[in-house]
């Protein structure tokens, strides 16, 4: 196994954040940091013990420019003792997703189409997750965020372009929550080029087990482009839990694109079917068997090819290797100049 730098952040998960009591779904949560010395630690490859690190203090991703000073604002990655975590390995059905209005030239504004849309089984997944977390007997559950980073990477490698920490959550009994969600069939596998080989292997094993679970939702995964249902919207916090039955759901990555496509077509901002939309976007990914052998030098394929994929998704979820968008964290330096954080 290749040597890595290990990052860990001790904190607590506030269970009240999850739907129906809150708005969090099954793959993005907020980890409430214990604001005390030693909460954020790193163990470099050549070290045997974890050491405190201040790499993330007052650091963040560049935001909008201040309209008064003209200086670029920094969106802190640790804000008021809280980090936002994107659970790596998984993609859960969308509990609330708004169409991406970029590129519509304002054509979506005022149309009433920008709403929080929802997928079938999103509620079921998060309700089952909360039921499991409640077995630990605390509404504020102690845990650790962990991320294994390549030695050539700096602190920014743990952060995605939205300022979220990307990694795993380890529960008090040592359970890896990310793998548990896959094993229970409560999420779809999502593999990225930033993941280490062993992480890919154990994720696939967990996903394959989860697809066999009769209690999970993975068995209801649908690789066909079902008709978009605009009546499925986010149900407000406090709503009663409903049985979603055996209604199938599309891969969340494709659903997000389908939601935006639908809004654009309704606003007459795009002419064509969903396949046309995907073809125009020309997003690319790697094929896992080839990526294992050649890494990022492997051929990149379009996310969708009408000729081969027809009205659905051509590969299995575990065949896709998606590219993690490059990100870095910065601080405001002298004179408001942005300075990249590269050292631990």
Regions found by a protein language model. Give the residues of each.
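Small beta-barrel nucleic-acid-binding modules, primarily SNase/OB-fold domains
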Residues: 1-344
């Amino acid at each position: 196994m290749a040597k890595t730098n290990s990052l860990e952040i001790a904190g607590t998960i506030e269970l009240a954040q999850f739907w129906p009591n809150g708005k969090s779904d099954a793959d993005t949560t907020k980890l409430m940091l214990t604001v005390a010395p030693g909460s954020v630690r790193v163990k470099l490859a050549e070290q045997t013990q974890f050491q405190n690190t201040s790499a993330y203090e007052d650091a963040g991703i560049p935001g909008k420019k201040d309209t008064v000073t003209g200086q670029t604002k920094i969106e802190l990655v640790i804000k008021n003792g809280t980090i936002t975590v994107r659970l790596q390995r998984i993609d859960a059905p969308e509990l609330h997703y708004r169409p991406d209005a970029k590129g519509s030239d304002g054509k979506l504004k005022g149309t009433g189409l920008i709403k929080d849309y929802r997928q079938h089984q999103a509620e079921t997944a998060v309700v089952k997750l909360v039921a499991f977390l409640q077995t630990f007997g605390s509404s504020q559950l102690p845990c650790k965020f962990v991320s294994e980073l390549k030695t050539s990477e700096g602190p920014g490698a743990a952060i995605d372009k939205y300022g979220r920490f990307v990694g795993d959550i380890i529960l008090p009994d040592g359970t890896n929550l990310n793998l548990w969600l896959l094993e229970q069939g409560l999420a779809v596998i999502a593999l990225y080029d930033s993941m280490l080989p062993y992480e890919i292997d154990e994720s696939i094993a967990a996903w394959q087990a989860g697809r066999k679970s009769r209690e999970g939702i993975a068995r209801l995964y649908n690789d066909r482009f079902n008709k978009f249902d605009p009546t499925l919207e986010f149900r407000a916090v406090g709503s009663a839990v409903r049985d979603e039955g055996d209604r199938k759901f599309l891969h969340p990555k494709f659903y997000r694109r389908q939601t935006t496509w639908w809004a654009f077509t309704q606003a007459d901002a795009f002419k064509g079917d969903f396949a046309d939309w995907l073809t125009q976007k020309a997003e690319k990914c790697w094929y896992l068997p080839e990526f294992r052998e050649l890494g990022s030098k492997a051929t990149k394929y379009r996310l969708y090819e009408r000729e081969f994929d027809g009205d659905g998704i051509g590969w299995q979820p575990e065949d896709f290797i998606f590219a993690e968008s490059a990100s870095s964290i910065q601080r405001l330096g002298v004179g408001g100049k942005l300075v990249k954080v590269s050292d631990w």
